[in-house]
């Protein structure tokens, strides 16, 4: 009751029927007015690729996120501020560039083992299921980072099957659903995935400007959760929040083509894509972040 108004239009956080408004004393009204102003400010700073309804729901949810996290949301971050491993700062590479190294990647770059890498660092190399949402929330202005994945933790739970998608809700509070690769294959009558078909899937599923979480199974085994982002100039970019693949980094060569060439031919149902910049984070999983 009392939440049926539209704050983006009437500039009221609560309707006149809500007890806060109907029976508010002077101090309570001042608090409501302050929250209403914050809602309006957050809506104003959101990108144009969100609908007004999405902006309103996200703005209200941001207040809940602030309360649950115990921090105040800042201004939206740029891609550079949210990315470049800023979502996972404790990640440490097990192998480091070395012209004389004994190990070599697909690009011919040579590496040697990182002497500073310790067994305890491994948890920050298997925490992709929190790095992806951490990046999305950093874009909104939440200065949070990913925790490491340890046995029995909620990160461990999210690493299993379709569980990773449970962190996202639609703006009406219902569970958000991913577009599964297997479902897409069935609609195309494809029996298996190929690099060309992965590209087709990415382009079709990520056609609108926005931030998308991708769950992909590797040809070599195992899987990964990461980010595809469609920019307003039409570019579709692979952004890796777990370990930096931005321009100038040692992993710069890991791009959308790399994903297409590395994906499994016969993926599990849990693999797929979900647009997440227009979703609400499920605060039941808030403990997967450091702040």
Describe the role of every protein-language-model region.
Residues 138-223, 227-241, 247-254:
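Conserved active-site-adjacent core of cysteine acyl-enzyme catalytic domains
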Residues 64-171:
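Active-site nucleophile-adjacent alpha helix/oxyanion-hole segment immediately C-terminal to the catalytic cysteine
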Residues 20, 28, 124, 129-132, ...:
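Stable alpha-helical elements in mature extracytoplasmic
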Residues 58, 68-89, 268-278, 284-289:
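Acidic, amphipathic alpha-helical interaction segments
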Residues 2-55, 60:
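Metalloprotease/metallohydrolase-associated module, dominated by Zn2+-dependent proteases
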Residues 39, 51-62, 154, 164, ...:
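Short amphipathic alpha-helical segments that mediate assembly, nucleic-acid/protein binding
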Residues 223-225, 229-291:
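Active-site signature of cysteine proteases
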Residues 42-52, 68-71, 174, 208:
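Surface-exposed polar/charged interaction patches
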């Amino acid at each position: 009751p009392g939440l049926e108004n539209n704050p983006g239009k009437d500039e009221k956080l609560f309707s006149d029927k809500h007890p806060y408004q109907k029976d508010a004393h002077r101090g309570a009204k001042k608090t409501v007015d302050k929250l209403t102003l914050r809602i309006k400010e957050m809506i104003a700073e959101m990108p144009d690729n969100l609908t007004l309804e999405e902006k309103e729901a996200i703005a209200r949810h941001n207040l809940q996120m602030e309360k649950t996290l115990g921090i105040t949301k800042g201004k939206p971050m740029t891609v550079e501020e949210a990315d470049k491993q800023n979502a996972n700062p404790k990640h440490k590479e097990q192998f480091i560039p070395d012209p004389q190294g004994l190990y070599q990647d697909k690009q011919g770059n040579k590496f040697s083992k990182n002497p500073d890498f310790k067994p305890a660092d491994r948890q920050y190399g298997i925490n992709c299921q929190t790095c992806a949402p951490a990046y999305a929330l950093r874009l909104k202005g939440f200065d949070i980072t990913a925790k490491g994945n340890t046995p029995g933790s909620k990160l461990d739970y999210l690493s299993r099957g379709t569980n990773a998608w449970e962190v996202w809700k639609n703006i009406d509070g219902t569970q958000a659903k991913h577009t599964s690769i297997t479902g897409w294959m069935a609609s195309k009558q494809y029996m298996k995935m190929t690099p060309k078909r992965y590209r087709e899937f990415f382009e079709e599923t990520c056609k609108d400007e926005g931030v998308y979480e991708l769950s992909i199974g590797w040809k070599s085994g195992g899987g990964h959760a990461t980010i595809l982002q469609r920019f307003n100039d039409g570019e579709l970019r692979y952004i890796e929040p777990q370990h930096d693949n931005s321009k100038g980094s040692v992993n710069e060569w890991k791009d959308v083509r790399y994903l297409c060439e590395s994906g499994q031919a016969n993926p599990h149902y849990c693999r797929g894509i979900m647009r997440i910049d227009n979703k609400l984070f499920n605060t039941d999983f808030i403990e997967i972040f450091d702040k």
